[in-house]
């Protein structure tokens, strides 16, 4: 059995914010497999099976504790199902990666992500997998705490849709094939929008007018 946790904040006002990209990914996984979310203590959960029959049982989890207390929805479930940290994947936003980049990694510090910070604190180890989805640093002068709670801009929606789709693919690959294969398949993902190429300037015509001979007299 595997536990996949999408980090985010509860409430419709947060549903389309940068901090909730983890929720978008686990929602997409649940949608693909026809899973129904149900309310439990501190979380909404959905069960699916991935891979060839009988498949790998995966419990998708969306903490309902607000970001800073995410560990309360995660650690008791690991304990209840007698799972070690190697069975856990946390899907999170990542301020330190440009929007459009995605990476799967094992362990490491929380990097200022307070949901991950709380899971590490309650679990007592950093040794669990993360799927990190880049949301970029805020523009100069903008508070990061305000930035992560801001909504996606209209021009970001297309890239966001691709990022969520590939994030769901990465969750499925991790659950069925393991960490190394998920890293190999998805750590080169780069969906950053490319600027339109600027046409090269055309050289000016400096040849000048062409000399011509006298006009021929028409025959009569």
From Swiss-Prot:
Known catalytic reactions: an N-acyl-L-alpha-aminoacyl-tRNA + H2O = an N-acyl-L-amino acid + a tRNA + H(+)
Cellular component GO terms, alphabetical: cytoplasm
Binding site for tRNA: 14, 66, 68, 114
GO biological process, one term: rescue of stalled ribosome
UniProt entry keywords in alphabetical sequence: Cytoplasm, Hydrolase, RNA-binding, tRNA-binding
Region (Disordered): 184-220
Family matches, as InterPro entries: Pept_tRNA_hydro, Pept_tRNA_hydro_CS, Pept_tRNA_hydro_sf
Known EC number: 3.1.1.29
Coiled-coil regions, chain positions: none
Main location: cytoplasm
Cell compartment(s), UniProt: Cytoplasm
Sites marked Stabilizes the basic form of H active site to accept a proton: 93
Keyword Cytoplasm: yes
Active site: 19
Site (Discriminates between blocked and unblocked aminoacyl-tRNA): 9
Protein origin, superkingdom: Bacteria
SUPFAM superfamilies assigned: Peptidyl-tRNA hydrolase-like
Assembly: Monomer.
Family: Belongs to the PTH family.
The protein's role, per its UniProt record: Hydrolyzes ribosome-free peptidyl-tRNAs (with 1 or more amino acids incorporated), which drop off the ribosome during protein synthesis, or as a result of ribosome stalling. Catalyzes the release of premature peptidyl moieties from peptidyl-tRNA molecules trapped in stalled 50S ribosomal subunits, and thus maintains levels of free tRNAs and 50S ribosomes.
PANTHER family in UniProt: PEPTIDYL-TRNA HYDROLASE (PTHR17224:SF1)
Protein name: Peptidyl-tRNA hydrolase
Provenance organism: Deinococcus deserti (strain DSM 17065 / CIP 109153 / LMG 22923 / VCD115)
């Amino acid at each position: 059995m595997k536990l996949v946790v999408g980090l985010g904040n509860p409430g419709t006002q947060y549903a389309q914010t940068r901090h909730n990209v983890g929720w978008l990914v686990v929602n997409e996984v649940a949608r693909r497999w026809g899973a129904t979310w149900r309310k439990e203590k501190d979380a909404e959960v959905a069960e699916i099976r991935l891979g060839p029959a009988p498949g790998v049982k995966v419990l998708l989890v969306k903490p309902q504790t607000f970001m800073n207390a995410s560990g309360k929805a995660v650690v008791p479930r690991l304990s209840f199902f007698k799972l070690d940290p190697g069975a856990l994947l946390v899907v999170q936003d990542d301020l330190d990666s440009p929007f459009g980049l995605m990476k799967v990694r094992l362990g490491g510090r929380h990097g200022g992500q307070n949901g991950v910070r709380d899971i590490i604190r309650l679990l007592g180890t950093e040794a669990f997998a993360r799927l990190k989805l880049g949301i970029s640093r805020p523009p100069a002068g903008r508070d990061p705490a305000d930035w992560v709670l801001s909504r996606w801009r209209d021009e970001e929606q297309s890239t966001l849709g691709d990022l969520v789709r590939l994030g769901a693919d990465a969750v499925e690959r991790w659950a069925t094939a393991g960490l190394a294969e998920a890293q190999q398949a998805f750590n080169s993902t780069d969906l950053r929008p490319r600027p339109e190429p600027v046409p090269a300037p055309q050289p000016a015509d400096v040849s000048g007018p062409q000399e011509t001979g006298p006009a021929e007299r028409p025959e009569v």
